[in-house]
Amino acid sequence: MRNEILDYFRKANGQFISGEQISRDLHVSRTAIWKHINILKERGYIFESSTRKGYRLIYAPNLLTPLEIDSALHTETFGRHVVYLSSTTSTNEEAKKIAREGAEEGTIVVAEEQTGGRGRLTRSFYCPFAKGIWFTLILRPKFFPLEASKCTLMAAVGVCRGIRRLGLQDAGIKWPNDILYHGKKLVGILTEMSASMEKIDYIIIGAGINTGMKKSEFPELFRESATSFLAEGIDVSRKDLLAAILAELEKEYEIAQTQGFDKVLEDWKALSLTLGQDVRVIMGEENYTGKAVDIDKDGCLLVDTGEKVERVIAGDVSIRPIDAPLPKR
């Protein structure tokens, strides 16, 4: 009922609504309405009240609370259960904990801030308070564990499509799952799982999307290599962006569950920024160059070195443009 009352005020666009009208339209007592409004006030919403006119909503907090997320969702299950945290070390770690305790599929863990955000190969990821979307989605798929690695590509497709829907049409995927915009990193994705030989217990998909950081607010180490919606001139609604991403993820997941991953791999190729490019493959102290020509049925990158086609497995390597400097050691 609280969500319905909040949605009712949103649709009023700042106009006063009498308690009698709300009571009549939502079939709830005026006392209950008053109690719900007081709870909303405690959660950061600001209402103006008038003896003759009733109430009007004049401020909603720019936070990814369950109420805010729910108001924007268009999914069946993804995001319908939200674990909300003001700050955490890692949403992935929180998600693993509740997944082990039986959290249902589609549950998301959302934090306003991550103090220990990380990506592939244990790289750090900058996650300041309310300047991005830091979340993890819990899945309990029915396909075999050998297929689990393809969820990384599925996640990249869903996130990239959601980002394109909110204005950054040129966003694309750097193999396997970074989302770039005009060569700069916009999103990091980290997929982890728990499984036996026969069955997947859970898969978690963690994503960090830069939304509200100015270029000057990025740490110097990332200033030239990272970007955000705001740095690209778009003041995006975080709840609308998260809702779009969850909707696209749910679509891709449904395809993977019912049709297999062939369509998902096609979707990934259509969004790829890596295929057709000259790349450097870095494997510990070793590195070689070649052209990224395709991905195989398992999502591995195929790199033509001129002498042979190498099969590159995600998680073992770093892929960089051929003219990029080697990482410092």
Segments the model singles out, each with a brief description of its role:
Residues 86, 173-175:
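Short loop/edge segments at beta-strand edges and connector loops
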